[in-house]
């Protein structure tokens, strides 16, 4: 007997997760590009590995902020706020200054 999920089961589960999250956040993931273009109009600067680590963690904070903004009119989204706090602490650890 195999308890591992099959590919179709995994895909159905993923679709269910997408639908649940989309009800909460909407299509906010489609806004990230426009927002990042405003923040980085000249593109990203060259970075070493440490810089890319900082950018990667900052991008996680950014993603949670975008998700939180999608729920701002409904009182916010505690999970996104909590996750952003954790990522911000990770970013502080990586900050040189």
Which residues are covered by each model-predicted region?
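Intrinsically disordered, low-complexity regulatory regions
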Residues: 1-97
